A protein has these predicted regions:
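Residue-level marker for buried hydrophobic side chains located in beta-strands
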Residues: 40, 183-185, 234-235
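Conserved, mostly hydrophobic/aromatic
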Residues: 31, 37, 95, 108, ...
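Structured beta-strand/loop patches that form or line metal/cofactor-binding pockets in enzymes
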Residues: 1-50
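Metal- or metallocofactor-binding catalytic centers and their adjacent structured scaffolds
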Residues: 33-35, 39-106
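Generic detector of well-ordered alpha-helical packing
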Residues: 44, 97, 102, 187, ...
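Metal-dependent enolase-superfamily TIM-barrel catalytic cores that perform enediolate-based chemistry
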Residues: 113-230
Length: 252
């Protein structure tokens, strides 16, 4: 059994601005896991709110976890242990994916089939970051032209406030009129409860599919208020790091 780590810088086609800042590229960590003549690969993307803000930090976290002894444990047992040890989710994702990729290759099966998924392809989306209406007008065609993309995720939660969010969104609606795409919104925790209530109603009137992470991680109590009388389905992202986080959201 052996591991190796490889840092790769991925340049973004366009800068991605969200409520917490702007990213121009991402230095991700690829994990290579070899055992019994088979090789599995996994990838970890660092994040400041995910417990490992650089590829080097991901590598350090994973080396420390591996050093605790992982031989003889199932993938699920290792996942549970990582959760109990509060291992950074973005770091452990690289190791977990490498294990599953290795298992699929050993079984001579596509990973999707090993996991019980029948479809070889699934619809995906592209994302447009927080921008001025002028930038949105030019960028939407560049993102959608000549693709089979079915959904556009729109980053809101602008530091300039909800009026800036509305202006951007209105331009997105205008710029997507000639494309058959659904619109989703991700605020990345950029709103408070009052702003989220207002924006969810406003966005629902404009046929948005759902809202993702309206409130900051750590402000989950406010989700109960949003859930009551909600105008849109609510998805959580930053608030849900491991599978054991899911039951807390079951009541709403």
């Amino acid at each position: 059994m052996g591991f190796s780590f490889h840092k790769v810088t991925l340049k973004k086609r366009f800068p991605l601005a969200i409520s917490r800042g702007v990213r121009y590229d991402s230095e991700n960590l690829f994990v290579r896991y070899e055992k019994d003549g088979y090789v599995g690969w996994g990838e970890g993307a660092p994040g400041e709110t995910e417990g490992a803000s650089t590829a080097d930090e991901i590598q350090t976290v994973l080396k420390q976890f591996i050093a605790t002894g992982i031989e003889g444990f199932s993938i699920q047992e290792l996942y549970d242990r990582a959760s109990e040890m509060r291992i950074s989710p973005c770091a452990y994702a690289a190791l977990d994916t490498a294990f599953w990729d290795w298992k699929a290759k050993k079984a001579n099966l596509p990973l999707r089939q090993l996991l019980g998924f029948s479809r070889p392809h699934t619809p995906t989306s592209v994302t447009i970051g927080i921008n001025s209406p002028e930038v949105v007008k030019n960028r939407v065609p560049l993102l959608l032209e000549g693709t089979t993309v079915q959904s556009l995720k729109i980053k809101l939660g602008s530091p300039q406030g909800i009026e800036a969010d509305k202006a951007m969104f209105e331009q997105v609606v205008e710029s997507t009129k000639t494309y058959d795409v659904k619109l989703r919104v991700d605020a990345n925790g950029g709103w408070d409860v009052s702003q989220a209530q207002h924006m969810m109603k406003w966005l629902a009137e404009r046929k948005v599919d759902y809202i993702e992470q309206p409130l900051k991680e750590g402000e989950e109590d406010g989700l109960k208020t949003l859930y009551n009388g909600r105008a849109l389905p609510i998805y959580v992202d930053e608030s849900c790091r491991f599978s054991h986080n899911i039951p807390a959201f079951a009541p709403y």
